[in-house]
Regions:
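Cofactor-binding beta-sheet edge motifs in enzyme active sites
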Residues: 1-200
C-alpha cells in the first residue's frame, strides 16, 4: 500500500532542501494549516521515539504522517542497512482515532498494519517471465518474516469524552513505507519514490 508514499517522500525532500529538521518542517506546516490532530500525533511520535537525540549507532530515523478512515497516524522508523538491504528495528506509532474503545486492539491493529505495510514496501512485487507470473506461492513470493518484524510501539492521543471513534483497521499500513524511505534518504542521500525497496 502506497497512497501516502510520494507525498511524504516529497515533503521530506523539501524539508532537506530548506535545511530544516523533518519534524520541525512538518510541525510548521501543520501549525500554519491549523491541523491540530496531525500536529498532536507528530509531536507524540517524535517525543516517544527520541527525535532530536542521536539514533543508536548505525541506525537512522525517518518520519511520516497520514490520515485515513478518520484517523491520523504518525510513525518514526529506525532503519539501518544490513547485508545490502534495509532493516527496520523499531517503529514508534502515534494514533488519533477519536475515543479509544479498546487500546489493546488498537495496538494490535497498528502492529499488524505496520508489518503488512512494511512487507509490501520492502518486498511486494510480482515479476513475469515470458508472460507468466514467477511467484506461484509463498516459497517464491517474498514477505516479511517473523525475525524481520520490528518492535512496534503504539501511543494513543487522548481525546475528550464524547469524541466519536474512527478507524484503526488500515491506518497503520500506509505510513510505514514512507517513514522507512525517509530514513533511507537520511542514511544514503537517495530519495526512494517507488516500491518495493528490495528488488527480486
Amino acid at each position: 500500500r502506497s497512497p501516502n508514499h510520494l507525498y511524504s517522500v516529497s515533503l521530506e525532500q523539501l524539508a532537506r532542501r530548506a535545511g530544516q529538521d523533518p519534524v520541525a518542517y512538518r510541525r510548521a506546516l501543520y501549525e500554519k494549516a491549523g491541523a491540530k490532530r496531525h500536529l498532536a500525533v507528530l509531536d507524540l511520535a517524535a517525543d516517544k521515539a527520541g527525535w532530536g537525540e542521536p539514533a543508536p549507532e548505525g541506525w537512522t530515523r525517518g518520519v511520516a504522517v497520514h490520515e485515513s478512515f478518520g484517523s491520523v497516524v504518525a510513525q518514526v522508523a529506525e532503519v539501518k542497512m544490513e547485508n545490502g538491504e534495509p532493516r527496520v528495528g523499531r517503529v514508534v506509532t502515534a494514533i488519533d482515532c477519536g475515543t479509544a474503545i479498546s487500546p489493546n486492539q488498537i495496538a494490535a491493529q497498528m502492529e499488524g498494519g505496520t508489518c503488512y505495510g512494511l512487507s509490501a514496501a520492502l518486498y511486494g512485487q510480482v515479476t513475469l517471465t515470458e508472460g507468466r507470473v514467477d511467484q506461484t506461492n509463498f516459497d517464491t513470493y517474498r514477505v516479511l518474516r517473523h525475525n524481520e518484524a520490528p518492535q512496534v510501539e503504539t501511543y494513543i492521543v487522548a481525546q475528550p469524552a464524547g469524541t466519536h471513534p474512527t478507524g484503526v483497521g488500515e491506518p497503520g499500513t500506509p505510513v510505514i513505507g514512507p517513514a522507512v524511505a525517509n530514513a533511507l534518504l537520511a542514511l544514503t542521500g537517495e530519495a526512494i519514490t517507488a516500491q518495493p525497496f528490495v528488488k527480486v
